[in-house]
Amino acid sequence: DVLFKYARWRQKNNLINRDKTVDAEIARLYRIAAENGHYKASINLQNGALRGRFALSSHERLRLSQQLIDAKVAAGYYFIAIYLEHGAAGLAQDPEMALRYYRKAADEGNPQAQAYVGDKLAPIDIAPDISRQMRRCAAEQGEREVSSDLGVNLKNNKRFQQATEAFQLGVAAGDSTSAGFLMHGFSGPEPMDRLFYLALEKDPERARRYEQIGAVLAKYSWAHPVVPEINDIVPLPPAPLPEWDGKLKWLEEWEANIPPPVPDAALIEKLAKAKQLNPATGRPLPTSPDFEKDSVARLQCRSGEPCPQSGYWQPAWRPRE
């Protein structure tokens, strides 16, 4: 967990002015943590690879996904679904099988898969009720964009109380769009205002707070802000409105930017050795059953990574996977 938290902090501080050398160090720490059973590190590593930040081979992607599945972590099914949908990670493109994996991931509780399946089932001639259930499950787990989609759907079906609750979940997850709907909803729109009417009593103070919170969420959307304390700031009626000092915990922590403990070199060495990994890269050593034999002929290290051995290095085009 020490490696994961430090890598996540480094990743947070490498979002804007991206340094590939830092990305390589982050991937190294995530790899070692993931191979030692830290599923969040595995998820962050694979998500980073999907976004082009970390370099993972097809073999690594499939192996890490299978490790998640074996550990009963639904994200493993979700990653396999993505690879099947796009014909990636050495898998043949198979949209039908991809849908099965998305549904399996959703049924096992993965919020991204629940949002995906919810979108597929949303049309009125398919399964809108199941879609709303899927989206609600995803929203309750903090899936940001799905909350506003659910809220709009419920609002348009005149389920105003449920819509308001969905938007509140969206604000908690960091969705500025949801905050905007609640801001307008508490501003007293007329019933004929089909866009913003939520059957709420006009409450200027609640509207002001949602506006202020929404501005922060929009400004920092790229950093994935969250407001888990939203019900302590703007609880939904009939709960009374408490005092609020205008502060958000996420923003305070973001601005403070306090680094977690730096992983000790001895700890990294110990964890790497336990799983037969190269501590310099986090990749399996030749003695490991997970070592990719063709990696020696194909690629020893990637741009930004420390070289695992001294000597002259020849640049090479990365082969198609």
Regions found by a protein language model. Give the residues of each.
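N-terminal leader/linker segments that initiate helical-solenoid repeat arrays
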Residues: 1-25, 36
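Residue at a conserved register position within TPR or TPR-like alpha-solenoid repeats
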Residues: 10, 17, 49-52, 84, ...
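Structural signature of tandem alpha-helical TPR/SEL1-like repeats
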Residues: 18-28, 53-64, 90-101, 124-134, ...
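Canonical positions in the second alpha-helix
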Residues: 32-33, 66-68, 104-105, 135-138, ...
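Short helix-capping/linker turns of helical repeat alpha-solenoids
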Residues: 36-40, 45, 52, 71-77, ...
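TPR/TPR-like (Sel1-like) alpha-helical repeat modules
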Residues: 164-176, 183-220
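Long C-terminal extensions of eukaryotic subunits of large macromolecular complexes
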Residues: 234-293
